[in-house]
Amino acid sequence: MHNYYKIVLIMVAFFAVIITFSNIQVEGAVCNLKRCQLSCRSLGLLGKCIGDKCECVKHGK
């Protein structure tokens, strides 16, 4: 039972870190990464923000 609490604590800490860092935005960044990824995914590509531009690239590059 003690290991169960350790696992739950680790999971809670992990999600807290993920949520915290996902809310941090770089000042002055114009490219919306989530929107970029979604639009490129519809083309079967991977969306990446390079500077203020969204670029669609093949997976594995």
Swiss-Prot record:
Gene Ontology cellular component annotations, sorted alphabetically: extracellular region
Disulfide-bonded cysteines: 31-49, 36-54, 40-56
Signal peptide: 1-28
Coarse class of the protein's main subcellular location: secreted
Tissue spec. comment: Expressed by the venom gland.
InterPro entries (UniProt xref): Scorpion_toxin-like_sf (IPR036574), Scorpion_toxinS_K_inh (IPR001947)
Keyword Secreted: yes
Entry's transmembrane regions: none
One Pfam family of this chain: Toxin_2
Compartment annotation: Secreted
UniProt modified residues of type Histidine amide: 59
Effect noted on mutating residue 37 to P: 97.5% loss of toxicity
Keywords, ordered alphabetically: Amidation, Calcium-activated potassium channel impairing toxin, Disulfide bond, Ion channel impairing toxin, Neurotoxin, Potassium channel impairing toxin, Secreted, Signal, Toxin
Outcome after substituting residue 41 to A: 83.0% loss of toxicity. 100% loss of toxicity
Annotated GO MF terms: ion channel inhibitor activity; potassium channel regulator activity; toxin activity
Note: Toxicity experiments on mutants are done without C-terminal amidation.
Function: Blocks small conductance calcium-activated potassium channels (KCNN, SK). Has also been shown to weakly inhibit Kv11.1/KCNH2/ERG1, Kv1.2/KCNA2, Kv1.3/KCNA3 and Kv2.1/KCNB1 voltage-gated potassium channels.
Entry's free-text remark on domains: Has the structural arrangement of an alpha-helix connected to antiparallel beta-sheets by disulfide bonds (CS-alpha/beta).
Protein family: Belongs to the short scorpion toxin superfamily. Potassium channel inhibitor family. Alpha-KTx 05 subfamily.
Name of the featured protein: Potassium channel toxin alpha-KTx 5.3
